[in-house]
Amino acid sequence: MKQSRIPRDPDGLPPLRAWLVGGGTGGHVYPALAVAAALNAHGAQFVVADTDGGRNRAMSRHTRWSALYVGSVGGMEAALVARESALPFHALPAAAVRGRNPLTMVRNLITLARGTGAAHRLIARDRPAAILGTGGYVCVPVFLAARLACVPTVIYQPDVVPGLAVRLLARLANLVACSVADSGRYLGLTPVDFERAVPQLETQNRTVRLIVTGYPVRQELFHADRRACRAVFGLSDDLPTLLVAGGSRGARSINRAIAALLPSLLPLMEIIHVCGREGDATFLRAAIRVLPENLQKRYHLFEYLHSAPDISGQEGLPSTPTMIAALVAADLAVCRSGASILGELPAVGLPAVLAPYPYVHQDENADYLVQRGAAVKVSDAALADTTEKGSLFRAIYRLLNCPEERRAMAERARALAQPDAAQKLAFLLETLVIRRQTA
């Protein structure tokens, strides 16, 4: 895509250029978009502990930034960035850094070399001051090129367990950030809370490598009005609301289970169901059509919901359904356990029944919330039992019929929230720029 021209400040000096790099899943894209918003806010304030004097102090920087999103050729991130932001986007060749088939591996290495060359040329032309990577194959060629061009980098690990690309890039990056301290044992690094890391970073201490920032989410999650969010979906005050979501690509096993359970669930609740764009809406609509009309009205089906709220309605209230509005409106969620649950569910204090997708380390994300009393977990295999004796129905029924337990889970979830995570990552980018300028 064609890049937009870098805007200039009134004094004639261009803002610093930041690259936000990531792709493959929404869990890699949404954190980058949240950091873009923080950079655009010109250094929102937050408080860190003064480890020397035992006092708290406000940290604020007001560097002006201009951001470019860098994704992979043919990746899902291009459409997602276009829908959710106004950021310019540039696509680079990228591929997996491993493969079982020797021929595929050779092709991937050629693609990696092409991507690294393209990234190096783009760096020379665009001159980024710092680069944030949030995961995905596209980070590899960008970070290799950045290393050659001496551009400072931060790699951010959204999930508890890092993928191969992040484990490799953690060795190249100037700083590594993570959502939760549990990631440290997988990266072979000692995690340091952001508040404790700041004084050491300011003194050019290079021994601090892994910094716990939390998972960055849009600030609207912390400020959205629950009553307004429920109104935009037309929800009743007399029934609890279940949010069903499978992540940025949907979740067929969850969708099929919910379709089978609709006759049992809808007499007890309203459902907001974000099913994804893989065609599952067809069988879900068929399942709802055979139910009585009064139950059909309790089912709100969407293939996709934009993340950012539209507040163009009267009195600044949400005027259209959005994912943020759905999260705030719900009393309980049923969802996968991609990286976003580590930030979004705590931000709104939403208890959840988590059904991790197998094979991609979602179990560890789920376990993080389950062990802290903010969620319960059912296996993907258990979703096949779509009777009222099945694990999914029993978990939903128990939690929606026990407001006290839901409230306790909500409080424990909110205790895990990191409202300043995006600002912290923005602060790390600025710290690297200052380091380079004063080196």
From Swiss-Prot:
Gene3D superfamilies: Glycogen Phosphorylase B. It catalyses: di-trans,octa-cis-undecaprenyl diphospho-N-acetyl-alpha-D-muramoyl-L-alanyl-D-glutamyl-meso-2,6-diaminopimeloyl-D-alanyl-D-alanine + UDP-N-acetyl-alpha-D-glucosamine = di-trans,octa-cis-undecaprenyl diphospho-[N-acetyl-alpha-D-glucosaminyl-(1->4)]-N-acetyl-alpha-D-muramoyl-L-alanyl-D-glutamyl-meso-2,6-diaminopimeloyl-D-alanyl-D-alanine + UDP + H(+). Pathway: Cell wall biogenesis; peptidoglycan biosynthesis. UDP-N-acetyl-alpha-D-glucosamine binds at T25, G26, G27, R218, S248, Q362. It is a peripheral membrane protein. Disulfide bonds: none annotated. Keywords: Cell cycle, Cell division, Cell membrane, Cell shape, Cell wall biogenesis/degradation, Glycosyltransferase, Membrane, Peptidoglycan synthesis, Transferase. Its EC number is 2.4.1.227. This is UDP-N-acetylglucosamine--N-acetylmuramyl-(pentapeptide) pyrophosphoryl-undecaprenol N-acetylglucosamine transferase.
